[in-house]
A protein has these predicted regions:
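Short, solvent-exposed loop/helix junctions and linker helices
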Residues: 65, 98, 185-186
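Aromatic-glycine-rich donor-binding/catalytic loop that engages nucleotide-sugar donors
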Residues: 58, 179-185
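NAD(P)-dependent short-chain dehydrogenase/reductase
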Residues: 4-73, 77
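Mid/C-terminal beta-alpha module of Rossmann-like enzyme folds, strongest
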Residues: 71-160, 165, 173-175, 179, ...
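N-terminal Rossmann-like NAD(P)+-binding domain of SDR-like oxidoreductases, especially those catalyzing
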Residues: 1
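Short secondary-structure capping/turn micro-motifs that flank functional sites
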Residues: 18, 193-195
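Residue-level "edge-of-site" marker
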Residues: 15, 122, 190-191
Length: 208
């Protein structure tokens, strides 16, 4: 399409995006996890053990999350470097090294004052647990003046898919982005923490 034209284009490919939006987004995995952990803490108390809501092999499989700021920086990099990234160049973008939920889940739970552990038989799916304990969320929302309808508008099917069904190794090759000089990276759990801080400032989440 761009051949012979004054413009060019780049295709930027993230894996699962972790980030913040001011309204609800059906594919906001970070928001779904945060709502679940907030309700879990309200119901079970600080220090409670939270089993990973997926399968055992999914808990150990590798993946490459993409924090929204890393994605945005790659898109800006491509826009201002058409000589390196144009002509239909395709670039994977992710936080950095691949991770497993065994590395990330305990840290996410710890952020909420909980103890993350591996999958456990008989665990209630995230979306069911939240719906069964909706009053606990409503109490938090009233206490902290949170936005309305967050549970109802959360894309629980997507959150379930990312943690439960998307349970195979998916290592993202970042070598092409690195070869043109894009070296931005972030610790995967830190991407969640920053996103959650932004959600709290926007009255989407209660204090941790």
């Amino acid at each position: 399409m761009s051949k012979g034209k004054s413009w060019t284009f780049t295709e930027v490919r993230p894996d699962g995006v972790v980030g913040f939006v001011p309204g609800s987004n059906a594919m906001n995995m970070a928001q779904g996890i945060a709502i679940y952990l907030s309700v879990f803490k309200a119901v079970r108390g600080s220090g409670a053990k939270v089993p990973f809501p997926g399968r055992e092999h999914g808990y150990h499989s590798t993946h490459s999350d993409t924090f929204q700021d890393i994605l945005a920086k790659m898109e800006i990099f491509a826009a201002v470097n058409p000589d390196k990234c144009g002509d239909g160049g395709v670039f994977n973008v992710a936080d950095g090294q691949t991770v497993t939920w065994t590395q990330v889940w305990p840290r996410l739970c710890e952020h909420f004052g909980l103890v993350g552990s591996g999958p456990a038989d008989g665990s209630v799916p995230m979306e069911e647990f939240v719906k069964q304990n909706k009053q606990a969320w409503d109490d938090l929302a009233e206490k902290y003046g949170l936005k309305a309808n967050l549970v109802e508008e959360q894309g629980w099917e997507h959150t379930h898919f990312m943690l439960v069904d998307f349970d195979f190794d998916r290592q993202y090759d970042l070598s092409r982005a690195r070869s043109v000089g894009f070296d931005e990276q972030i610790d995967t759990a830190e991407g969640y923490f920053i996103s959650w801080d932004r959600m709290r400032a926007a009255k989407i989440l209660p204090p941790a």
